[in-house]
Amino acid sequence: MDFWKFFPFLALSSMWVLCLASSLQAAPFRSALESSLDLGTLSDQEKHLLLAALIQDYEQKARKLEQEEQETEGSRKGSSSSVISQKRSCNTATCVTHRLAGLLRRSGGVVKDNFVPTNVGSKAFGRRRRDLRV
């Protein structure tokens, strides 16, 4: 009995899906190497502007890398007695947890001085005392 209530809905929905599928067309695939920018159609002024923008972007990236290298060299000279190993960064929960644990370990007594342990014993506040003599 339930099948006859469900059958018209099933038939109409399948017809609707078929109509939608027939009206849709797949977009043509364009490879990453194929570009809409054709250098043959650019004017000389556009080519010069494009080249200037590419050079400016390259110079900005080179300056940024140079500043990062100087910062790392400065930090290495400041702490010449310790060797710093740099690893690839990872953003999974395990990696973040390990990084935070390392940060806490390196911070030393700063966290330990301000940390007050919680009272979690058998005689802790809020625990009910059980009488074994019933």
Swiss-Prot record:
Compartment annotation: Secreted
UniProt entry keywords in alphabetical sequence: Amidation, Cleavage on pair of basic residues, Disulfide bond, Hormone, Secreted, Signal
Pfam families the UniProt entry points to: Calc_CGRP_IAPP
Main localization, broad class: secreted
Signal peptide (residue range): 1-26
Stored InterPro entries: Calcitonin-like, Calcitonin/adrenomedullin, Calcitonin_CS, Calcitonin_gene-rel_peptide, Calcitonin_peptide-like
Residue stretch(es) of the prosequence: 27-86, 131-134
Phenylalanine amide PTM sites in chain numbering: F125
Biased composition (Low complexity): 77-89
Keyword Signal in annotation: yes
Disordered: annotated segments: 65-91
Cellular component terms per the entry's GO annotation: extracellular space
Function: CALCB/CGRP2 is a peptide hormone that induces vasodilation mediated by the CALCRL-RAMP1 receptor complex. Dilates a variety of vessels including the coronary, cerebral and systemic vasculature. Its abundance in the CNS also points toward a neurotransmitter or neuromodulator role.
Family: Belongs to the calcitonin family.
Protein name per UniProt: Calcitonin gene-related peptide 2
Natural source organism: Rattus norvegicus
Gene for this chain: Calcb
